[in-house]
């Protein structure tokens, strides 16, 4: 699948912060995004979805990430998030905003991982390479 669609490799690797290894792992784990319908499925499938430990009003536990996906992809995405904070303005802004709000740095880093995966999914769905200077026109 990976070598049959070089345009998919180009699209995924166009996202700032996603390298060759991460591109390969994401495409292999998702089988070329064949059964992924939205970015929430992608995040959950790769094991980076936040889950809350609650029971009604009596128990309020810490929010964790579900580790149902491959640990290898999770660790690679973690490293990509650290790289993206230096080079991807949207990721840097998200990280700084969450840390300034009082969130733990690891929580902010997982949010950056999810932001990267959202960007990857958007690029794959639209079939347009990532543009880090893109701004959404709001009317």
Where are these regions (language model features)?
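A detector of single, family-specific signature residues
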Residues: 1-139
């Amino acid at each position: 699948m990976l070598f049959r669609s070089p345009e998919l490799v180009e699209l995924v690797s166009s996202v700032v912060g996603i390298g060759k290894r991460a591109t390969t792992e994401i495409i292999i784990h998702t089988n070329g995004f064949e059964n992924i319908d939205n970015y929430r499925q992608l995040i959950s499938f790769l094991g980076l979805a936040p889950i809350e430990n609650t029971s009604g009003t009596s128990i309020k536990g810490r929010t964790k990430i579900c580790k149902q996906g491959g640990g290898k992809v999770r660790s690679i995405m973690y490293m990509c998030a650290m790289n993206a904070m230096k080079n991807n303005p949207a990721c840097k802004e998200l990280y700084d905003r969450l840390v300034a709000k009082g969130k733990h740095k690891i929580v902010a880093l997982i949010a950056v991982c999810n932001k990267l995966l959202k960007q990857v999914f958007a690029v794959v769905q639209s079939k347009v390479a990532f543009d880090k200077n893109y701004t959404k026109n709001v009317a």
